[in-house]
């Protein structure tokens, strides 16, 4: 059983290491969504996390198991064009492939619809075909839009490979 709630400023200290451990470093290698081979450094920091939690028309949604342990999170932001941006989907690497990511995706789409959004979009590192395939199985499709990875900004991580780009994926809601 997974329960959901919106993150608050009080969650920042737990969320930052949870997200960073889900994407980067040795702990992330326990799951299939690791970026450790292409990016080092952090995925987020306390300032960025607080900004996302307290942002206008935005939400960080938390998933907890039946014991109250944090098992996942996702960032959502309503955009001016009635789209919703989904980012930072994180599942505890030890709990991946157990349906938590799918539950977070479903919850995200429900929240976006409640906000009046008709489309969900996200950006994924292009070098992650297995992750892109995961989202495609959930109804998302590449839009053809790309953007460069911010290689010169260590707040987003330290590239181990040059020329990283993001591919945009979207799904009508």
What are these model-derived regions, one by one?
Residues 9-12, 55, 66-69, 79-83, ...:
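Short strand-connecting beta-turns/loops that link adjacent beta-strands
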Residues 1-13, 167, 173:
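Conserved N-terminal entry element of GNAT/NAT acetyltransferase domains
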Residues 17-49:
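Conserved GNAT-fold acetyl-CoA-binding loop/helix
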Residues 64, 89-97, 124-126:
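A short, internal acetyl-CoA/4′-phosphopantetheine-binding micro-motif in the GNAT/acyltransferase core
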Residues 91, 97-110, 137:
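Conserved acetyl-CoA-binding loop-helix of GNAT-fold acetyltransferases
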Residues 118-121, 125-132, 138-173:
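C-terminal "cap" of GNAT-fold acetyltransferases
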Residues 43-62, 85, 162-165:
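A short helix-loop-beta-strand connector motif used in the catalytic cores of GNAT acetyltransferases and
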Residues 62, 69-77, 85-90:
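Conserved beta-strand in the GNAT
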